[in-house]
Amino acid sequence: MLLEVALIEKKDDGVRIERKVRYRPKPVIEAIGPKKVPPEFFAFIETSTWDRNKKELKFVNVPTSHKISSMMENTGVLRLREAGGQCERTMDGEIKLKLPFFLKPLAMVGEAVIQREGLKILDAELPVLNRFIAEVVRAPK
């Protein structure tokens, strides 16, 4: 669940839309061991480019916390394509946590949690995306 979405920057050249958006999801982890995790650790900036011709969105998500951004990489591509008179959405992405050797087992758990929560966000955005497809992607030219 997203607590905040703020558009920081948007450029539209007619073919591509470049944007930066700040997201602050609801924290899913309150503590790691005895240490509390501040809610701001979950905030991130999405830098993305939507290519109208390719119907493709390339993105990089960078945590706003410097401490977290040095330990995490998240990139991906979202594609829309015609599929039997309907629109198919596919997403390829990578979440990588760069932790010290002795914390490597936590990286696998952390990556799985981040992926699960990211999929929840994608599911919640589906009604909005369906409207976007109807009004923008399939709009008469």
Question: How does the language model describe each region?
Answer:
Residues 17-20, 37-39, 43-44, 49, ...:
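Beta-strand/loop substructures that line and gate deep hydrophobic ligand-binding cavities in soluble
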Residues 2-5, 34, 82-85:
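Short, mixed-charge, low-aromatic patches
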Residues 52, 106-140:
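A conserved amphipathic terminal alpha-helix motif
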Residues 26-32, 57-64:
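Short Pro/Gly-enriched beta-strand edge/turn motifs at strand-loop
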Residues 1-27:
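Hydrophobic ligand-binding cavity/cleft-lining segments
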Residues 11-13, 53, 83:
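Structural motif
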